């Protein structure tokens, strides 16, 4: 039944994703973060106090998320086993973001194919932190490919990884870790102190999933009739060409698979950030690379699910 729940949740994400008006735990987690952050800022003046308060905020948000998820599942199971199972499927489904990621990328891709730069820049600004107002088509393509490659880890592979380790409650706790990082884990002045713990704990949580993504995306590249060997080679060579210890694993693998370069200079919050280049520019990046990257994401996601099912069967001895 556990494996069936995983599969149904994955299929639901593949088919319908996250409908905008449906209730979603990540939105609730975001509201909790906003509430706790307001309290921390009120009572923790100064950088040192903010760092400590940020650590407390991380424990409160992640702990509360795990506890509520565990409690809701336990209560649902007591009401009826099938109800508990249905709630588990829903929880797992909400931790996966493959369809949402693909949809967001396609929202940028469509106007870009029509040479509508203004619209593609606006749509891109919804999913990236960099300044998109002056980006040219190649830069927009690169930003979308990077976003899909990076979020293949924290939107799909990592939730499945923590689902395997600790069930739906731990997968939900991971989403809290990831949401904390996306809301406060920045290096500029406003968040540097309060978000330090959140940023570092996100690095810790994604350490193994990011490295697993290198292998899965490399295999996916071969299955998609791209260069799997080059994906693995470039992925390994450029795995540390990023300020994050995790992001370049998937980005470099995708760059190798496609034969393009990612990274380079960008503007964030009004400041120029010069990132190392990732991959070799064997050809110019094109809008078609967006759809190729989405395909890589889905194949890697399928491989991740299959791997974890096989591991579960191997450990439990049952299908």
From Swiss-Prot:
Which pathway does it take part in?
A: Cofactor biosynthesis; adenosylcobalamin biosynthesis; adenosylcobalamin from cob(II)yrinate a,c-diamide: step 4/7
Subcellular localization: Cell membrane
GO CC entries:
plasma membrane
Per the record, the major location class is membrane
- GO biological process, any: cobalamin biosynthetic process
Query: Key word Cell membrane present in the record?
Result: yes
This protein's name: Cobalamin biosynthesis protein CbiB
Phylogenetic classification of the source organism: Bacteria, Pseudomonadati, Pseudomonadota, Gammaproteobacteria, Enterobacterales
Gene that encodes the chain: cbiB
